[in-house]
Amino acid sequence: MNAEPSAVTPAHALPGWRRAVLKVGSSLLAADGGGLSPRYALGLAQFVSASLAAGREVVIVSSGAVAAGRAIVPAAAAAGTAMAARQALAALGQAQLIGLWQRFFERPVAQVLLTHDDLRNRRRYLNARATLNELLRLGALPVVNENDTVSVDELKLGDNDNLAAIVAALIDADVLFIASDVDGLYDADPRTHPDARLLAEVPELTPAVLAMAGGSGSMAGTGGMRTKLEAAAKAGAAGIDTVLFNGRRAEALRELAHDRLSGTRIHAARSRIAARKHWLRHAPLEPGAIVVDAGAAAALSGKGASLLPGGVVGAEGDFRRGDMVQVLLRGDDGERRIARGISQYSALDVRRIARRHSRDIEAILGYNYGGNVIHRDDLVLLQD
């Protein structure tokens, strides 16, 4: 494959996708640097609606709460430190932001507020993933934003670009769309170089490509092209392509709705399956293991099944829900490591539900994190 970026040409095809994250910047929702406006949000909502009608799933990561708060209380009236003022404005504006999105959709819109700490902690990460997947299953439209009211370090350049990449990996999205007020990535700053070319395809984020990124070009937003490329690198490491496009251009949205590329597509560094398996294979192990019987081992190895409690013999160590553990098979011929994966239950809980049916979990524990001890998406066979 050609590793050089290519200039835009008509009718570049965008590979089909089933699940996407759409990141919407403040420059599209508060174009004048003031309060929220539906001017560009409407076109984005129509793109989302068309995608949902086609049987696809979309999670929106939306900036704009601080910008909305400024219109409610002038910044000069906000007391305290600059950080405290921004956090207060975020609290005031978040209700306005979710209300803006709700007005465009007949289906329920769900507000999900996250911090980077939520996604660094493995157990909270799993809970966030389960919540988003359940919202999608229910047919709701999740609208994610950073929880600026309680964040400290996170209120900085480009947070929602990077948050969108993390959310894309969290829900196993096929593509990350980043909508802003620029057409995509140019080989030079188009504001100072009239002959700058818009790049349609970026096969690899090389240092030369990163050097093409300029600074922020909008009043309302906090992230420039550099942070968008950083987000694309994060998504690419998880096997997810990124598309940068101009959310102010109705034509761009129409093209994307018909799977035609408008803007810049940044290719993933590796396939999603390869990225996931690599992470599962090399993530640090917690002390402990889940011991399974021969039937469970055969189901894992031969059928690609999830690990159910009925096939579990016991658990070793003191691991917690969300920890990476080994899966062992013990028999007359000794012990064999057959897999590693993320346990949905603690070691104590695994011991209590071992040899039991999945439907009995809640009766035994008083709660239920799902019918699998390790879901097949969170498990890698060691002979793979």
Model-identified regions with their sequence ranges:
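C-terminal catalytic "cap/lid" subdomain
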Residues: 2-384
